[in-house]
Structure formats: C-alpha cells, structure tokens
C-alpha cells in the first residue's frame, strides 16, 4: 500500500506568443505603397487618406509619402501625405 497520496498535477503553465501588433511606421516616416503602418485588432486607429485597411484591420500605405497621425473627434486617424516633387 502507498504511504503517500498521489500528488496532483498543475493545470497552468502555458502561454501564447505575442502577436507583434502596434505601430510599424512612426509619424513623419517615409513609406512606399504596400508598407504596413499599423497592425491592430479592430480599428483602434482609423484609416484616412491614401491608406488602405486590410481584412485583419491592418493599415497600409497606398502611395509614396510621409505618415501623418492625427486625432479628429476622439478618433485616431492615419494618413499618408504625398511628398511634393521638386
């Protein structure tokens, strides 16, 4: 007969890897078409002019230019401003 009761096993001890979300291009940074500007879950930051919105709510550049973040009516918006050619 066993002199000790069987020890229970822990049911915790696992964790998922981070999803690498967040802002990928800062305000004023140069982008080309297709560059990812923000990776997010839901539209925390809304798309503005010259940016597209992917099915996973990723915001990406549609034109060459500089990134611009602004707030309008409590909504964060990201635009890409075209660089004036000399």
Swiss-Prot record:
Residue ranges, annotated region (Disordered): 1-24
SUPFAM superfamilies in the cross-refs: Ribosomal L27 protein-like (SSF110324)
Single biological process term from Gene Ontology: translation
Gene3D superfamilies in the record: 2.40.50.100
GO cellular component assignments: ribonucleoprotein complex; ribosome
Family designation: Belongs to the bacterial ribosomal protein bL27 family.
Name of this chain's protein: Large ribosomal subunit protein bL27
UniProt organism field: Rickettsia felis (strain ATCC VR-1525 / URRWXCal2) (Rickettsia azadi)
């Amino acid at each position: 007969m066993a002199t000790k009761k069987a020890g229970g096993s822990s049911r915790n001890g696992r964790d998922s890897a981070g999803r690498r979300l967040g802002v990928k291009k800062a305000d004023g940074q140069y982008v080309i078409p297709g560059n990812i500007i923000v990776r997010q879950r839901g539209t925390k930051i809304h798309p503005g002019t010259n940016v597209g919105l992917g099915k996973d709510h990723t915001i990406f550049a549609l034109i060459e230019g500089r990134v611009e973040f602004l707030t309008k009516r409590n909504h964060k918006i990201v635009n890409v401003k075209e660089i004036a050619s000399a």
